[in-house]
Design a protein with these regions (language model features):
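Helical element adjacent to the flavin cofactor pocket in flavoenzyme catalytic cores
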Residues: 1-13, 152-163
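Rossmann-like dinucleotide/flavin-binding elements
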Residues: 14-28, 36-45, 49, 56-144, ...
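Local beta-strand N-terminus motif with an aromatic residue
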Residues: 6, 29-30
């Protein structure tokens, strides 16, 4: 969707490009968006160099194998996304309508009031036991989006993800 949208709106995307003021001025652009990306931060924890310790890039992009009991360090947006990825095996329910409806208890036969009254959610069992760790004392995921944070927290709770705050490392 986004690639197509960029094409149809004639947005020029330049990846892995060093720029300076002169090159930006010479480019004659109407608008400039600098998206510098992000690199995983490696915490100073004894044992972090162990082969069992993976960055989110190792897990998501390189698809390195992940064990059955996983601690995710950091409960921001990336930590939540990685945790969501880890509890699913194969195709995520967000990519399969019938599985999504079943997981969230949505009545597709239009018999339940509002489509949900009296319908029990039936999430599939998590693929792994996941612990989502946060140093802050606030509620885990408190910094997520106001309109979507609740759904991310609920989805992980439904998969028995243990969300721990006030963690020291």
């Amino acid at each position: 969707y986004f690639n197509r949208k960029l094409q149809t709106t004639n947005v020029e995307v330049c990846l892995n490009t060093r720029v300076d003021v002169a090159s930006l001025v010479e480019g004659g652009y109407d608008e400039i968006i600098l998206a510098t990306g992000i690199a995983p931060r490696v915490p100073a924890i004894a044992g972090v160099e162990n082969a069992k310790v993976l960055s989110y890039l190792d897990v998501i992009l390189a698809r390195k194998p992940v064990g059955k009991r996983v601690a995710v360090i950091g409960a921001g947006g990336i930590g939540f996304d990685v945790s969501e990825f880890l509890v699913h095996e194969g195709v995520a329910t967000s990519q399969d309508r019938a599985a999504f409806w079943k997981e969230w208890g949505i009545d597709t036969h239009l018999e339940a009031r509002g489509g949900v009254a009296g319908i029990k959610a039936a999430p599939h069992a998590p693929a792994r036991e996941v612990f989502l760790l946060q140093r802050k004392t606030s509620k885990v995921g408190d910094g997520l989006g106001k309109t979507t944070g609740w759904i991310h927290r609920t989805g992980l709770k439904n998969k028995q993800v243990q969300m721990l705050n006030s963690v020291e490392y």
